[in-house]
Amino acid sequence: MALRGPAKTVAQTVSVVIFMGALAWASVPLYDWFCRVTGFGGVTGVSDVAPEDILDQTITIRFDGSLNNHMPWEFKPVVREMDVRIGESGLAFYEAYNPTDRPVAGSASYNVTPYQAGGFFNKIQCFCFEEQVLQPGERVQMPVTFYVDPEIVDDRDGKHVHTITLSYTFYEIDLPEEYADAQDIEENSDTSLN
């Protein structure tokens, strides 16, 4: 039985709304995948070790840290910028502090600017690879080990890059189960004492 008149219009409208909702839901993971594959949008590479080829040419790396509106931590780079030789591994630290009276879990997203440098900036180790949990009042320094691929000097756009900015944004996430269970036990014991 074919739909006619207003029923057909309603069915088409509902179909369009469902399709647009599915497209919106899928856009974030699809864009993330696209950026990781192409290096578009300042997404960095990941490597196990720095290359053996270290150039005499240096490049300035700037560090930036920010928080999502709902993240209660304080978060900043320990050093705002450093010069590294291209191909040499660098080590920088970011400091995070949880001023609240509860454990808070966070996950960091990152990007590199200018965007054409993203494909040449490689992380060896990074706090952003894992979720971070800070206890109440805890302050930590979190490392990131990186290098700039020597191929940047041969790239049509990359060879003009003299400064790269590595930016992180921390977002609050749900506590992992082991922390959430421990907090529930602590809260229950506190209420039973009152």
From Swiss-Prot:
Periplasmic topological domain residue ranges: 36-194
Protein name: Cytochrome c oxidase assembly protein CtaG
Topology Cytoplasmic: residue spans: 1-12
GO process terms (BP): respiratory chain complex IV assembly
Species name: Roseobacter denitrificans (strain ATCC 33942 / OCh 114) (Erythrobacter sp. (strain OCh 114))
Family under the similarity heading: Belongs to the COX11/CtaG family.
Keyword Cell inner membrane: yes
A Gene Ontology term for the protein's cellular component: plasma membrane
Pfam name, any one: CtaG_Cox11
Lineage, uppermost ranks: Bacteria, Pseudomonadati, Pseudomonadota, Alphaproteobacteria, Rhodobacterales
Keywords (A to Z) from UniProt: Cell inner membrane, Cell membrane, Copper, Membrane, Signal-anchor, Transmembrane, Transmembrane helix
Single GO molecular function: copper ion binding
Function: Exerts its effect at some terminal stage of cytochrome c oxidase synthesis, probably by being involved in the insertion of the copper B into subunit I.
Predominant subcellular localization, coarse grouping: membrane
Membrane-spanning parts: 13-35
UniProt-annotated location(s): Cell inner membrane
Membrane topology, record value: Single-pass type II membrane protein
